[in-house]
Each structure stands twice: as structure tokens, then as C-alpha cells.
Amino acid sequence: MKLRKAWLLVLLLALTQLLAAASAEDAHEDASDSENPIEDDDDEEEDEEDEDDLEVKEENGVWVLNDENFDNFVADKDTVLLEFYAPWCGHCKQFAPEYEKIASTLKDNDPPIAVAKIDATSASMLASKFDVSGYPTIKILKKGQAVDYDGSRTQEEIVAKVREVSQPDWTPPPEVTLTLTKENFDDVVNNADIILVEFYAPWCGHCKKLAPEYEKAAKELSKRSPPIPLAKVDATEQTDLAKRFDVSGYPTLKIFRKGRPFDYNGPREKYGIVDYMVEQSGPPSKEILTLKQVQEFLKDGDDVVILGVFQGVGDPGYLQYQDAANTLREDYKFHHTFSTEIAKFLKVSLGKLVLMQPEKFQSKYEPRMHVMDVQGSTEASAIKDYVVKHALPLVGHRKTSNDAKRYSKRPLVVVYYSVDFSFDYRTATQFWRNKVLEVAKDFPEYTFAIADEEDYATEVKDLGLSESGEDVNAAILDESGKKFAMEPEEFDSDALQEFVMAFKKGKLKPVIKSQPVPKNNKGPVRVVVGKTFDAIVMDPKKDVLIEFYAPWCGHCKQLEPVYTSLGKKYKGQKDLVIAKMDATANDITNDRYKVEGFPTIYFAPSGDKKNPIKFEGGNRDLEHLSKFIDEHATKRSRTKEEL
């Protein structure tokens, strides 16, 4: 009996273990089975995320596109109106209500036409693809091909243009810009009174940016009477033409007059090109018919009188004079005469170039006129050099209107006071100018000028002279961009003479506009101020990437996080500095670092600070800025992998 109970107990234990094992296996199978739903949930979430990226939202009737959903959205649409905008752009905000009205109108079109907007600051791929360089930029997409819209930003005009493009039989108008090759170049250029030619490379970013503006200008100028043609040359294919005209960069633009080339120095957008070429199409020199005109120039003029005296339009010297005038027409007013009466008054024979200063700028220390013999064999470049050399009086009047064209040469000695050549104040103005003349005659290597203290109030303030208490102040601006102020004292010729001599001997300390030097400057991006520019940027032992910015600049604000990331990326390199400078609050103490817009970025290589490399053409993102640094960094700052 006991034995039977024992066996029953053993059997019961065995069954219990079997049941436990089976239960564990079922649990394991359940767990295994349950893994698939979890994975499926993950896949579903990923699919949902992908769908979210591709989802197109609508805001007030306008579709919102980005880099991810753009292609899917436009794939099945014949016509789409696109606006590229920036969230901070004032013009974009102003245009938004009008754009929503356009969307509403085109939605009711038969068939409906989609209207979309793209934040170009975040959709960088699309902005690059469509060459967006300003905001807002409007384009019409026709069967996947972008059509530039350059009309007014009004509902009426935009809707009309979109409906025109949406027609089934619409095709893009033929290109107005002429395409030149070695086969047709000379024939076209030699027969044109004036023509603008662009030498470009298909891969060049600046050329791509210029292309739509250039074509718009070509269309506008083709409507003139007579029309002014614009042409282009692919310099990578037409290498002989590129070599013939010394094309070394892209795009290179040249003006041709009956085959003679002249540099194009104008703007690179539609209206700038149009205005510049219209001005260039006129005669470079104006004919003077009477002696009275010459006398009025001398009595009441405000600038150098440039007068060519010739026998007639067939005079070979006259043709050379015209060529020279064309090269300088933006900076000077040229005149010519065929009058023997005027020649007699000037006491010169025919075939002469005469330069004279108005009476108010004449002095006993300089000749009344400069005369050059001009014949058919005289080079236009020689005439040009002569004009530039003798265009300024010994002490001229520096004004905001002539500063860039007349007084860019350094060193420049400037005397500031109340300059007024009107009848009532001319005597006082000339009194101080005569004091300056007495010094200027002894320093022919320097340029001297007087300037009205009100016109240059900001400059006077930056020099620390606005509170000097003196009626007359003086300063010297040197070749490197440094400024030197004369200590406030009673002004006379002796004081000015002493000041200029001290500058010549290198005994003066420059005045530098500068924010306070940062106490803690160990961040990834070094802060440069006027007083530290030389110490940081011009350090000969270090490569420096310097960004010049303005606090109010939208593009600068957009760049800031990217630039900080760049600083962090290269922070470990001891011989490379990533830096920035508020160019509105600090002096740039070296004129090789020219800033004409914001942001401006330069790479200052170690050992060659006088030849900084400007960042141009690429996107201002981490990838392109890093590539720029790596391309130009010296061995000192290259990474170990590169070495």
C-alpha cells in the first residue's frame, strides 16, 4: 500500500514537471509570436513618418512644399505656380495676402492650377535647384520646366501670366541673347555699334545666377530703337576666343564697339544692365560749339574740364581720343571741339588734349592747364593715363558724390571745415584752402583735399574730432585703411605741415573705431573688434576665416548657427581660427579686406595676409564652408588625415 502511494507521488511530480515545461514553451511561443506585432508597429510608424514627410499641407489655399514632398506633388501637374520665400523677408510678408488671393482665383480656374510656396531657407535643395538668390522669387512650373516670372507682384498680372503659360499650345519664347562662336563672332561684333558679350562656363555658379537676369536685360534692350544686342560665348568650348580676349574668370563681360573691346563695369541684374548699356550706347564725348561754353565751365564748373581740340571727325587723333573717353566715361565728362576760335583762346594748335581746373581750384602753385599732343599714333591708354594723372587740382573738394571716383588714392590728407563755395562764403572757404595749399605743394606724393564737416560728420566722429572745439580739423587716411587724426589745436599751415611730416616719418598712432575688447573670447568663434583685428586676423602664424557681418542683416542671422557649428568643428586646430566681426561697429584696419555687402567671408592664410581669399559662389552651409577652408588651409592647419 505504501509502495503504491509512493509511485503515485512520483507520477504526480512527473506530470507537474511536464505541465510546467509545456507552459514555459507555450509562453516562449507566445513571446515569439508577439515580436511580429511589435516589429509591424515599428514599420507602421516609419511608414507614417515617411507619409508625414510626403504629406502636403494647405495654408489659406496655398500648398506648402519642401525638399521631400516637392517631386511627388508636381509630378502629375501640367502647371504649378511657385513662390520661394524667407520667413524673415519683409517683402514676402507684404506679398502673402496677395498670393493667397491668386491661389483662390487659380483654384477656380478650369482646370484648377495649383499654387504653392516654399521656404527657401529650409528647402535648400530646391532653392539651389531653381537658383533662388532673392525673396520672394516667383516661378511658373510648366511640365516640370521652370519659367521665370519677372512682372509686377499683383494678382492681375500673375494670374494672366500663369493662365498664358498653362495653355496646351504654349511654348517658351526663343532666347533673345545671341550665341557666338568662332565662326560668327567677328562678323557680329565688328558690325555692331555696341554689343555686350558674356564669356561664361556652363558649370559656373555666378554664370547660372547671371543667366536669367542677362536674358531679361537682352529682351528689354532689344525693344529699344536702335536695339542694343547682348550675346554670350561658352568659353570652355570657344577656347580661342577666351584666350584672345584674356578671359581668366567667369563670367567675364566685355562691351564691343565696332569690334573694339572695353571692360564692362556695370551691375549684373536686369535693370542695372539695361541702364548701364543705355548710357554706354551714347557718345563718350560731347561737342563744345562756342567759346562761351568753355568760359562758363571755367567760371562756374565744379570738376576738371577735359577738352579735345581737333580738326574734325576724321582727325585720326580724334578717334583715339574717343576710345580713351570710352574707357573713362563713367568717371569723367569728356568734351571736344573743332572750333579754331576756342583753340585760339586756349593758345593751342589742333590735335591737342587740354585739361583745366575751374577758377576756384586754380592756384599759383600749379599750371593753369595741362596740354598733351594727340595724333593718330597716340595710344588710347596713354591719353587715359594723362587724364587720370592731371584730373585733380593740388587741393580739391572731396564730396560724397566724387569720393569713390576722385579720392580713392592713398595717402589722402583731408581738412574738414565748413566748405561752401557760394558767393557769400567763398572767401572764407578759400582762406582755409590756401592754408592747405601751402603745405600740399611740399608733398606731391600725397593727395590733399578739403571736405565739408557736415558731409563727413560720421567720419569726423570716428576720428574723435566731432567734439574737438576747433573750426578746422585734419586727418590722414593711409593705404592700409588706417586713419590718423591731427591733435585739435588752432589750425594753420605750420600745424598741418608738422602733422603731415610726422605721418611721413611714421610717428603717428592710428585712430581705430572699435567695440570693447571681449574679456572672454574662448568660444568656437573668436570675436574680432577694431583694436584686435591686426592681432587676430593678421597673425602671420595662423590661418583665419573671418566673417564680416551686420547685426541687422537677415542673411547674417541665418548664417550664425552654421558658423558656430563650423567653429566647433575646427576648434581643435591650434593654427586655424574661425572669427567674426561686426563691420558696422569696428574699423577694418586693412584695405585688402573689402566689405561691400553682408555677410562677407575671407580666408586669411598664414604667411600671406595681404592676399585674402574671398568666399564666393557656394552655399553658406557647413559643407561648403568646410570645403572652402580645407581647399585653402596651409599645411600648418590641415588635419592629420589630409597630411
Swiss-Prot record:
Motif CXXC: where?
89-92, 553-556
* Chain intervals for the UniProt region annotation (Disordered): 24-58
Q: Which reaction does it catalyse?
A: Catalyzes the rearrangement of -S-S- bonds in proteins
Q: Which GO terms describe its biological process?
A: blood coagulation, fibrin clot formation; chaperone-mediated protein folding; platelet aggregation; positive regulation of protein folding; protein folding; response to endoplasmic reticulum stress
Which CDD domains does its entry note?
Answer: PDI_a_family, PDI_a_PDI_a'_C, PDI_b'_ERp72_ERp57, PDI_b_ERp72
Return the motif ranges for Prevents secretion from ER.
Answer: 640-643
Q: Which residues form the signal peptide?
A: 1-20
Q: What is its main location?
A: endoplasmic reticulum
- Which cellular compartments is it found in? Endoplasmic reticulum lumen; Melanosome
Molecular function GO terms recorded: integrin binding; protein disulfide isomerase activity; protein-disulfide reductase activity
Q: What is its EC number?
A: 5.3.4.1
Disulphide bond pairs = C89-C92, C204-C207, C553-C556
Q: Does the keyword Lyase apply?
A: no
Q: How is it modified after translation?
A: O-glycosylated.
Q: Where does the record place the Thioredoxin domain?
A: 21-167, 167-299, 503-634
Post-translational modification N6-acetyllysine, affected residues: K364
Similarity remark: Belongs to the protein disulfide isomerase family.
Q: How does it assemble?
A: Part of a large chaperone multiprotein complex comprising DNAJB11, HSP90B1, HSPA5, HYOU, PDIA2, PDIA4, PDIA6, PPIB, SDF2L1, UGGT1 and very small amounts of ERP29, but not, or at very low levels, CALR nor CANX. Component of a complex containing at least CRELD2, MANF, MATN3 and PDIA4.
Protein name according to UniProt:
Protein disulfide-isomerase A4
Q: Which organism is it from?
A: Rattus norvegicus (Rat)
